[in-house]
UniProtKB/Swiss-Prot annotation:
Keywords: Cell membrane, Membrane, Transmembrane, Transmembrane helix. It is a multi-pass membrane protein. It comes from Bacillus subtilis (strain 168). The chain crosses the membrane at residues 10-29, 164-186, 209-228. GO terms for cellular component: plasma membrane. It is found in: Cell membrane. The keyword Cell membrane applies. It comes from the Bacteria. This is Uncharacterized protein YobJ. The lineage of its organism: Bacteria, Bacillati, Bacillota, Bacilli, Bacillales. The keyword Transmembrane applies.
Amino acid sequence: MELLDIWNWIQQNGILTAVITGIVALLFNQRQKSIERFYSQSGETLEKILEPMYYSLKEIKNEEDENHKMVLIEKFFEEYSGKKGKLSKLRNILLIDQILNTEDCFREYILNKNSENRKKLFYKMRMLDQAVNKEYRSIFVTLNKNYNWYKVLFRTNYILSAVFVFVRWFKETLAFFVGASAFAFIPLLYDKYLGEQVLGNWLEVNKLIFGLSCSALYIFWIIHYFLLKDTMQRKDEISLFQEWFDKTKLGKWTNKNVWGKIGNWNVERRARRVRNDEDV
């Protein structure tokens, strides 16, 4: 039975069509309710417990006096003790377990105050600070990931908004092609070296697609970075790679001999323009 015949048969059976429509509507409504509940709970988690906890741990981390640091740690566990029932609002059992384990370490230090337990407690507090910081940033970006994006769009005219939307869309499309072509290397390489080579020259084609996509993605990432830097709530993969690359010898050479010269050229060009305007 062809797809057209199946579609005609479904149309002729109104009850089946109604059932399918009802199931799709039910699944869609459940998904929407789940999304709304997630945003509501995440907003409460961020406001009521995660943000205050984040800044409390930051204060502990920045305190240099160890005695005062211990006072702050004690206040922290007085506020966020498992006995008070606040931790359930975190809705992350792994983070809750880490807080409880750190609290146990603190209680152990209170009972037996020695340097070993003190070092262990400080280490646990550093790990907890990193975990809370990660959770805080993750939820914050999830709730506000498009805030800066819409802020930029609403303050620009329609033509520039269309350009910005195209740049962002094309960058994300190129990122998909890079990922898809990178994943395609697995079956293509297997077919070429271990298989029966039934895929022919697709490996060479995929190499070309991958290379062009990577080059185009980097170009559009630079455009996106300079035009829409303020819209990014978090560093993307290319930004993280760029930070790592800048620390390498090749990256330092590139920044000095390529981007540095381009920057100097722009400065000189602006200076010449200012001088010409003054002469006029």
